[in-house]
A protein has these predicted regions:
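N-terminal active-site beta-alpha-beta segment that forms phosphate/nucleotide-binding
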Residues: 1-103
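Short, solvent-exposed loop/turn segments at secondary-structure junctions
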Residues: 47, 72, 114-115, 149
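Short, active-site-adjacent cap segments at secondary-structure transitions
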Residues: 48-50, 129, 151
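Surface-exposed, charge/polar-rich loops and edge strands
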Residues: 7, 103-108, 117-120, 131-175
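Charged helix-capping and loop-helix junction motifs
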Residues: 123-128
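A structured binding-face within diverse protein domains that lines the active/interaction site
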Residues: 94, 111-114
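Short glycine-/acidic-enriched loop or helix-start segments at secondary-structure transitions
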Residues: 51-54, 77, 118-121, 153-154
Length: 175
């Protein structure tokens, strides 16, 4: 299932990514969890993932945006301080070169390959987010994905997997 969904996402056009990402951001900006959040964990989109980066410029100086930095078996987060402070990390994804953020994260915007109606998530398979989320039980977790990535049937999940508080697609929000 993971490979099929990733392939379908990679086939999206630039216009489809921009349109659907804008629809998701529009919903997100109306949600109290985002409005009230001081610290927001983002991600750098790869392979046509939903692109939330326009929020960085729009809310610059109003919110602290964080991005993941991966290590061999773990993930930490660092504040975003402009594109010129981003360097490709060990997985080839741009990461901030700022000091590690140790405070509370109000809202986490989490990518995924597949989500279900019960807000379970399948990621890329490395377990980075699940291990990280377990250390932040009080943070609000929103999954973001395209409509075709949200399945009506349950996706496989285990005890160590973390359910999202909400899943947002261009068409709907569940949670």
């Amino acid at each position: 299932m993971r490979a099929i969904m990733e392939q379908r996402r990679r086939m999206l056009t630039k216009e489809e990514v921009e349109k659907d990402s804008a629809l998701i951001m529009s919903q997100l900006e109306q949600m109290s969890a985002f409005v009230e959040a001081q610290t927001v964990l983002m991600y750098y989109p790869v392979h046509n993932e939903v692109d939330l980066r326009p929020l960085l410029a729009k809310y610059q100086g109003q919110k602290t945006f964080l991005f993941p930095v991966t290590h061999r078996h773990s993930m930490e987060v660092r504040p975003y301080d402009g594109e010129d402070m981003m360097r490709k990390g060990r997985l080839g994804v741009p990461e901030p070169q700022t000091p590690t953020f140790k405070g509370h994260i109000d809202l986490m915007l989490v990518p995924g390959v597949v989500f279900d109606q019960h807000r379970h998530r399948i990621g890329r398979g490395g377990g980075y987010y699940d291990r990280f989320l377990s250390k932040h039980p009080t943070s609000i977790k929103y999954g973001v994905c395209y409509g075709f990535q949200l399945k009506k049937h349950d996706v496989p999940h285990w005890l160590h997997d973390h359910k999202m508080d909400r899943v947002i697609t261009p068409q709907q929000s569940i949670g």
